[in-house]
From Swiss-Prot:
One of its GO terms (molecular function) is NADH dehydrogenase (ubiquinone) activity. It comes from Prochlorococcus marinus (strain NATL1A). One of its GO terms (biological process) is ATP synthesis coupled electron transport. The lineage of its organism: Bacteria, Bacillati, Cyanobacteriota, Cyanophyceae, Synechococcales. This is NAD(P)H-quinone oxidoreductase chain 4. One of its GO terms (cellular component) is plasma membrane-derived thylakoid membrane. It is a multi-pass membrane protein.
Length: 538
């Protein structure tokens, strides 16, 4: 498979963006404070903002969005006898998510301002997680990817186990079992692909793996394992059950990291490994991804509609929206796959905003039950306005990023001639059910929170105050790109369209190979008693 040669970095921007927050985290225990965590808060905010600026500088100084291949490429021999190298780079698949990660993390630090219990440990974990998540998107070596993938598991586990709600131990244990257990498939697939040629030193680099002529059976086996691993993180129904429990116990900044970044790791990995490195298997598995996407959309939307717990309602809404990512990845059109990429960025912003507002509302009401929240709109008018704007973004209101990303997925899939017309019509019709349900459950949620039957005991609470400047600032920072992308999507799509076009072209070649092989088998085989070469019958 021909792919462009990587372009070497003039300056180690990506290594710096990974190592800077990790080194910053290691300094946290030595920061003097008076027990209130004021100093460490400001320190973490400065480190996260500098990391964000480093990624922005990397984009403007060393990244050309018109090029398909890897840029900002760095490769340093690490353990040569084992085939391990420090290899990082960015293309259109990774650069938008690197920027999203550093942006969301800096806002999550600001959202964590009220944290007073073990603040040093909390901000240490946020900074370490920042570097680990950037590494997931930037590394260009499959074993390094596995290490980065595992690195972000432990901060999330501790966030849930230490700062979570009443069922925090259950949620944390379930999270680590699901995610760490499924990660074994990444390691096994990576080792199998790296040692594929046999003999000599293995090579786990993406560029090397993309050029290997893996057999179709080998691809199908690796694809199956990776689909399970990445399906847990996306998540794909029925591998999703850890997510509502995790969101149900997490605090607001952890919500932002989970919804804004963690879920996108699964979508990115499906594009990077399943679609790019295993194209023949992807051509055969793609219809399954489409079906799973439809199941995600409908099942999660119906479940969200039935939820009375605010966190779980938004969690299932996230699962539903990620179904569009699956449909886009399963399509063989640049428009549909581009829509999946945009949906990941869009949902990262929208999901982070909604979950932050859930946390802010809980801090005031101390309840997550919609039945107990009625009538708080008269005391929290600005909060209601923020909720309304973010809910409209989530229900894909025209002029916001969610609308254009879902529209691209729909149009890209419906016009994709790889699939038969009846299949496209059925999938589009079923997916439309989720689009219809989303405004119903989100608008009814707003009504129940702010304009339902008044809870006199809740209304009388002195702490039922309106949004404060810090909260308004965080939501404003998220709404600006949501609206900006919605009004002018090219500002985002131009960053990755070249890489998406190249990916789709290679996958279409795989589709043609499979069709050609099937046609050859159909024409050359005939019924034969006592042999395994029986004909393939229509």
């Amino acid at each position: 498979m021909l792919i462009p040669e990587p372009i070497q970095a003039d300056f180690p921007w990506l290594s710096l963006s990974i190592l800077f927050p990790i080194v910053g985290a290691l300094i946290v225990p030595f920061i003097p404070d008076k027990g209130e965590g004021k100093e460490v808060r400001w320190y973490a905010l400065i480190i996260s903002l500098i990391t964000f600026l480093i990624t922005v500088a990397a984009y403007f100084k060393g990244f050309d969005p018109s090029l398909e291949g890897l840029q900002l490429y760095e490769k340093v021999s690490w353990l040569p006898d084992l085939g391990l190298t420090w290899s990082v780079g960015a293309d259109g698949l990774s650069m938008p998510l690197i920027l999203l990660t550093s942006f969301i993390t800096s806002l999550a630090v600001l959202a964590a301002w009220p944290v007073s219990y073990k603040p040093k440990l909390f901000f240490f974990l946020i900074l370490a997680m920042d570097g680990g998540q950037i590494a997931v998107f930037a590394v260009q070596d499959m074993l390094l990817f596995f290490l980065a993938w595992e690195l972000e598991l432990f901060p999330v586990y501790l966030f849930l186990a230490i700062w979570g709600g009443k069922k925090r131990q259950y949620a944390a244990t379930k999270f680590i079992i699901y995610t760490a257990g499924s990660s074994l498939f990444i390691l096994l697939a990576g080792l199998a692909m790296g040692f594929f040629q046999g003999g000599g030193v293995p090579d786990f680099g993406y560029t090397h793996l993309a050029q290997q002529n893996f057999g179709r059976g080998f691809q199908l086996l690796c694809y199956s394992g990776l689909l399970i691993a990445f399906g847990v993180k996306l998540p794909i129904v029925p591998l999703h059950t850890w997510l509502p429990d995790a969101h149900g116990e997490a605090t607001a900044p952890v919500h932002m990291l989970l919804a804004g970044i963690l879920l996108k790791m699964g979508g990115y990995a499906l594009l990077r490994f399943n679609a790019q490195l295993l194209p023949d298997a992807h051509a055969q598995f793609a219809p399954l991804l489409i079906v799973l996407g439809v199941v995600n959309i409908i099942y999660a939307a119906l479940t969200s509609f039935a939820q009375r717990n605010l966190k779980r309602k938004i969690a299932y809404s996230s699962i539903s929206h990620m179904g569009f990512v699956l449909i886009g990845i399963g399509s063989f059109s640049s428009l549909g796959t581009s829509g999946a990429m945009l949906q990941m960025v869009s949902h990262g912003l929208i999901g982070a905003s909604l979950f932050f507002l859930v946390g802010a509302t809980y801090d005031r009401t101390h309840t997550l039950q919609l039945d107990e929240m009625g009538g708080i709109g008269q005391n929290m008018r600005i909060m209601f306005a923020l909720w309304t704007a973010c809910a409209f973004a989530s229900l894909a209101l025209p002029g916001m990023s969610g609308f254009i990303s879902e529209l691209m997925v729909f149009v890209g899939f419906v016009t994709d001639e790889v699939y038969t017309l009846p299949f496209r019509i059925v999938v589009a019709s079923l997916a439309a059910i989720g689009v219809i349900l989303t405004p119903i459950y989100l608008l009814s949620m707003l009504r129940e929170i702010f304009f339902g039957k008044e809870n006199a005991k809740l209304i009388s609470k002195a702490k039922l105050v309106d949004a404060e400047p810090r909260e308004i600032y965080i939501i404003a920072c998220l709404l600006v790109p949501i609206i900006g992308i919605g009004l002018y999507p090219k500002i985002m799509t131009d960053t990755y369209i070249s890489s998406i076009d190249g990916l789709v072209k290679r996958d279409l070649l795989a589709v043609e190979r499979i069709r050609s092989d099937r046609a050859t088998i159909m024409s050359n085989t005939s019924l034969s008693i006592g042999t395994i070469e029986a004909p393939l019958l229509d």
